[in-house]
Amino acid sequence: MAIERTFSILKPDVTRRNLTGAVNALIEKAGLRIIAQKRVLITKAQAETFYAVHSARPFFGELVESMISGPVVVQVLEGEDAIKKYREVLGATDPAKADAGTIRKEFALSVGENSAHGSDAPETAAVEIAQWFAGNELVG
């Protein structure tokens, strides 16, 4: 098994309800270490760039508006097969289809306010981490 790093965003629906600690507890219970974390307000331009892959999708505008509606917590997680493990603890995008005990089943309000984002591949994780963190901020 390989030690990996992955990127996470706890979305405004989590920060607005003061659930950051509860979500972090699930992350750590899954065996992942939070090696970098900061609370930020992202700009519309940052949200559009981050989610550019979805720019042609009908939900793009709503996604961007949701992401800039309040603070987010950006994180770097580290552990054995971190990308796969975090995707499992996240749960399905649609919280109604997510397994019990996952972040989205326990905390998401809807598909649009689904509490968290996680990288889907090592290449994506590397790009997303570099977009939000300098190398000296990763203190695993």
UniProtKB/Swiss-Prot annotation:
Record-linked NCBIfam families: PRK00668.1
Gene Ontology molecular function, alphabetical: ATP binding; metal ion binding; nucleoside diphosphate kinase activity
Main function: Major role in the synthesis of nucleoside triphosphates other than ATP. The ATP gamma phosphate is transferred to the NDP beta phosphate via a ping-pong mechanism, using a phosphorylated active-site intermediate.
Active site as annotated: H117 (pros-phosphohistidine intermediate)
Organism: Beijerinckia indica subsp. indica (strain ATCC 9039 / DSM 1715 / NCIMB 8712)
Binding positions for ATP per the UniProt entry: K11, F59, R87, T93, R104, N114
Domain of life the protein comes from: Bacteria
Classification via HAMAP family: NDP_kinase (MF_00451)
Biological process, per Gene Ontology: CTP biosynthetic process; GTP biosynthetic process; UTP biosynthetic process
UniProt KW keywords: ATP-binding, Cytoplasm, Kinase, Magnesium, Metal-binding, Nucleotide metabolism, Nucleotide-binding, Phosphoprotein, Transferase
EC number: 2.7.4.6
SUPFAM superfamilies: Nucleoside diphosphate kinase, NDK
Record-given protein name: Nucleoside diphosphate kinase
Quaternary structure annotation from Swiss-Prot or TrEMBL: Homotetramer.
CDD domains xrefs: NDPk_I (cd04413)
Family that this chain belongs to: Belongs to the NDK family.
Cofactor: Mg(2+)
Cellular compartment(s): Cytoplasm
Swiss-Prot/TrEMBL catalytic activity: a 2'-deoxyribonucleoside 5'-diphosphate + ATP = a 2'-deoxyribonucleoside 5'-triphosphate + ADP; a ribonucleoside 5'-diphosphate + ATP = a ribonucleoside 5'-triphosphate + ADP
GO cellular component, one term: cytoplasm
